[in-house]
């Protein structure tokens, strides 16, 4: 489906690591290489990549890995969410990562992200406090989404406990897998030879059942004190 959707207008492929399970990135790389003749770069980064960029939505997969490589260093660019409901949280916010691109200065990409997140200012508050460094410029009409010091402190504290949280989630998921083994449901495979999940969500498809039956299951689970949800409604159903 991805290959069929690519046209000369395609500027990026945005896969989603749903529930914490990494996508098949080898397959995506094969597709972008196969379709590279359709891609017309419009800036220096795109020219250096020489293929349609893979920009991964890793909101669910902080701590996951694909063939031994942590998510965040698999796709060309990746974005993570640190929202309050995520495995790894700073209460709000997130981060972006990228793989090194030959011919492109990583520091230049970093500075561009800084401009985008700090409403175009070319110096942050700390830099402006240094002797004689008060002057700054506005390089563009960008966004206000820089992380606060408090959020960063929460994130650093989370780093210390996160390996234990991942191990705990894996233990719970493996217990669920055993419990659901003989039931008529389809499950995501969180842990395989190719990938290790972050265990963000445990998704269950009720095979051959309609929405009415699903809703009854949700109600019964709620009565048992177990919260469940539907992730996610297709856009046309909203």
Language-model features and meaning:
Residues 12-16, 21-29, 38, 42, ...:
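PLP-dependent aminotransferase class I/II
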